[in-house]
């Protein structure tokens, strides 16, 4: 989640230039996902129907991957806006799920809350580090997008594996 967020933040100026946005317009266009994320937090707080439903979490992971890729490859403003709706909603669902399950699903709330925060730190550091390494190694301006997308895809596979193992064992 935070790997994708920080990669988008780093690539936003180039993406804005690609679709012809000036600095002010870029700030407005690229802030949409923050507003969607805030709305999604409120919705998830008020509606408990998503609790302990694997499909919601998996949809958040897959949706984050898809919206991330669309956002980074968008060639027009409407597509940038549409992809941010998905990205904002999915990033909120994943963040809220992580925190909720860390705090609600165990007796050691503070320990699991600390693990949640540590994983955020890994994403904040790891996304830009992986992105920089990918661009340095390949020289391609899109290498950061594909490297982080690979990590997100691996996360989808890992979560599916864990879910399957938990159901069968």
Give each language-model segment a name.
Residues 92-107:
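Intracellular juxtamembrane helix-capping segments at the cytosolic ends
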Residues 78-86:
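Paired small-residue
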Residues 10-26, 104:
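Short amphipathic helix-loop junctions that connect adjacent transmembrane helices
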Residues 39-53, 135-136:
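Helix-to-loop junctions at the C-terminal end of transmembrane segments
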Residues 72, 146-169:
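Multi-pass alpha-helical transporter architecture, strongest
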Residues 133-152:
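A membrane-interface helix-boundary motif in multi-pass transporters
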Residues 55-70, 149:
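Structural signature of the two symmetry-related core transmembrane helices
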Residues 109-137:
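A late C-terminal transmembrane helix in Major Facilitator Superfamily
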């Amino acid at each position: 989640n935070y790997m994708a967020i920080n990669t988008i933040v780093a690539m936003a100026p180039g993406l804005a230039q690609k679709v012809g946005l000036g600095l002010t317009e870029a700030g407005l266009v690229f802030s949409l996902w923050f507003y969607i994320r805030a709305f999604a937090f409120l919705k998830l707080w008020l509606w408990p129907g998503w609790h302990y439903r694997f499909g919601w979490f998996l949809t958040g992971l897959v949706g984050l991957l898809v919206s991330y890729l669309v956002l980074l490859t968008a060639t027009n403003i409407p597509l940038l806006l549409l992809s941010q709706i998905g990205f904002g909603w999915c990033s909120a669902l994943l963040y809220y799920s992580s925190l909720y399950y860390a705090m609600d699903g165990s007796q050691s709330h503070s320990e699991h809350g600390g693990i949640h925060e540590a994983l955020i730190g890994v994403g904040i550091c790891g996304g830009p580090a992986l992105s920089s390494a990918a661009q340095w190694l390949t020289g391609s301006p899109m290498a950061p997008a594909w490297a982080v997308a690979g990590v997100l895809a691996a996360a989808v596979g890992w979560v599916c594996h864990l879910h399957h193992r938990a159901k069968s064992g």
